[in-house]
Amino acid sequence: MKAAVLYEVGKKLEIIDLNIGKPKQGEVLVNMKAAGVCASDHHVIHGQIPYPTPIVLGHENAGVVEEIGENVQGIQPGDSVIMSFVSSCGNCVYCRTGLANHCSRHYSDPEVQHKLFDNTFRIHDQEDTGIFQMNKLGGFAEKQVVPADSLLVIPNEVPPEVAALIGCCVTTGFGGIVNLDNIKTGSTVAVFGCGGVGLNILEGAKSLNANKIIAVDISDHKLEFAYKFGATHVVNCLLYTSPSPRDRTRSRMPSSA
């Protein structure tokens, strides 16, 4: 299969042929259909997030199940799936107490975080060098073996290029605000930064019936999108030095930012 591999920080991704193994217990082989390019991928490429190399990036993914390993339940070949960028082992204290997003085995070590849970590789290059998978996923590839617990089955009719974004920017943004307990009906919310995550925070604020939703960014293009995602007011901070964007939003009484 082909994949885009980062061999060295600061260098371009290399599209090369890789060998891929069979899914083991609790794992699934997925044909990747779409992968979002997240800011985190750029941070890794430029060394702003220390990840091991060589590595296949991509953690906003959608695909179709090709093969399942032993003891995989609720997933069948042919299922359309999206992926969580935080894999959970199901056995550590966090996973057992409903805090799987803090899985200690996933975050225990940078190298372990980007291998499968048995601490081995499923993909190798032609020199048999093991290739890391970003967050045990690695969507910048034609196929990947991933933990079954990272997958969520979705309706087949959902376009993969739409579904892929749910894996990070939607869950991070929308989930981040709807899981707060201080956003009530009628609240005023200010969102600083209207990238993929910020836009989904706006949508989450709208779903919580916030009264005023103020979007702050330096890009008019992003602020135009902000209106579509629920913003009632926008502020381009490059246009205001006095009062500052902070004071300008305060004048509209934000209860959360």
Predicted regions and their residues:
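Residues that mark the start of a beta-strand
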Residues: 2, 27-29, 188
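Conserved small/polar residues in nucleotide/adenosyl-binding loops
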Residues: 240-249
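Cysteine-cluster motifs in flexible loop/terminal segments that predominantly coordinate metals
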Residues: 87-143, 148
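Glycine-rich beta-strand-centered segment in the early N-terminal region that forms part
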Residues: 21-35, 45-96, 100-101, 109, ...
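Cytochrome P450 core scaffold surrounding the K-helix E-X-X-R motif
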Residues: 40-42
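Mid-domain Rossmann-like dinucleotide-binding core that forms the NAD(H)/NADP(H) cofactor-binding site
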Residues: 80, 142, 149-151, 155-239
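Hydrophobic alpha-helical segments, chiefly the membrane-spanning helices
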Residues: 253-257
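Extracellular beta-rich ligand/substrate-recognition surface
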Residues: 6-12
